[in-house]
Amino acid sequence: MPAIQPPLYLTFLLLMLLYRIITLYVWSLSTITYKTSVRHASLYQRSFFRWSVDHSL
């Protein structure tokens, strides 16, 4: 048994930590993207509605 090789549970723990970090990163990125896209969509709808009302009169 070589001393350089880390224990199995340590490797598993590291993989779990990496998985958690990646999941958190992806989740936060998708949430931020979703919020900004929703905000832009609502702004666009509002301006489009105002433009259509102005041009219908």
From Swiss-Prot:
One of its GO terms (cellular component) is virion membrane. Residues 1-8 are virion surface. It is found in: Virion membrane; Host cell membrane. The keyword Membrane applies. Keywords: Host cell membrane, Host membrane, Host-virus interaction, Inhibition of host NF-kappa-B by virus, Membrane, Transmembrane, Transmembrane helix, Virion. The chain crosses the membrane at residues 9-29. Its main location: virion. It comes from the Viruses. InterPro entries: SH. The keyword Translocase does not apply. It is a single-pass membrane protein. Residues 30-57 are intravirion. GO terms for biological process: symbiont-mediated suppression of host NF-kappaB cascade. Plays a role in the inhibition of the host NF-kappa-B pathway. This inhibition occurs at the receptor level, by preventing the signaling of TNFR1 as well as IL-1R and TLR3. Belongs to the rubulavirus small hydrophobic protein family. Interacts with host TNFRSF1A, RIPK1 and IRAK1; these interactions interfere with host NF-kappa-B activation at the level of receptor complexes. Interacts with host protein UBQLN4. This is Small hydrophobic protein. It comes from Mumps virus (strain Edingburgh 4) (MuV). The gene is SH.
